[in-house]
């Protein structure tokens, strides 16, 4: 509990320091906040997402997963974009037999979403998700190649942005895992580029026992968009979740801190200045 309080305190201090250093948030920054909440936005971006699970394993240690997840969009003409997302996990995993932890890399995920170039009321993306066998040890991932479908659905109505990222990955090998993932999100954008966010990640291990299948967290937090040096947009957010349903070995709480660096194109900057995102 002490570590959790320290983590939240550091995040709040960081938010306050950045907030006080910014003066006057333009309409374009509000539009940038909405853009950062769209997984299939045609924009280069570089998020760092840090997830901490508390009281994990028999010794009650913390598990930490830092996801480095660059997003690289490509135009396929006037009608469609291809949104490429890579997730590189760096995992600090507590031991199940000793009161120690170790750090390594997990299996890399690559997703390619085909998405319309022009946004409608319902924004969507669809494509494959691949799991690459890059885990540096069995404690960090299955180390098996996997593949499955992935879908993004969302809508933007006034100050609201809501939707979900859904995928299911089956791996091929001795373990042959079969796992489901849904990251649903609801954002409400506030004045001065602040926003409220709830974006829990719900997972299911289809091969686990019935009472061990699901991890269902519930919670949310706050975020803010600033411009570093007046030029580079950065979205920051902090969230806290309570695990309503969980398998054995996981604690009740988890936190997430995220930094989301954005690099909009010239045409996108013009759209944001006109409030067309």
State each model region's role.
Residues 1-12:
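Bacterial N-terminal signal peptides that target proteins for export
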Residues 21-23:
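N-terminal signal peptide c-region/cleavage motif recognized by signal peptidases
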Residues 26-172, 176-277:
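Transmembrane beta-barrel domains of Gram-negative outer membranes and organellar outer membranes
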